[in-house]
Amino acid sequence: MSSGLGRAHVFMAQPHYQNQFKGVLGTGAWPGTLNIDLYGDNLSNYKGLRVLAGLEKGESAESAEPIRIQGFERSGRSFGGATAFKAEISRGGDEWISCAILIPDLTRHTQTAEVISSSFLREALPCEDGDEIIIRLI
């Protein structure tokens, strides 16, 4: 995992998004994302999710259900849409925390999964930059 740009909270705190995250997580989301750098098969699997989200061309072996997060406009500023996939996250595989992989329609993170949860994942897992994290789709 790695630190992001520190800007996710601006988007995550928006009430329009938070209301939609309740449908994904069962509750509102922590106002931030956990960034997971992806390599090898994990990157291929993530690209499959991007295909399911309609962001890349190709075929996907993934069977996860995409959940659409609608964008909106507020005070002349556009907030883009995203696609979420329900998942669980763990640091060692013993304890799992409900989460979702969030793939914004517009992102620079094409090799990094952005994970949302009702928990502050850095403390709940706990984890820090460089730690290996396990995510499984549900």
Question: What are these regions, as identified by a protein language model?
Answer:
Residues 124-128:
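A short glycine-leucine-enriched loop at secondary-structure breakpoints
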Residues 117-123:
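Short alpha-helix capping/helix-loop boundary micro-motifs
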Residues 1-116, 129, 133-135:
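Long, compositionally biased stretches
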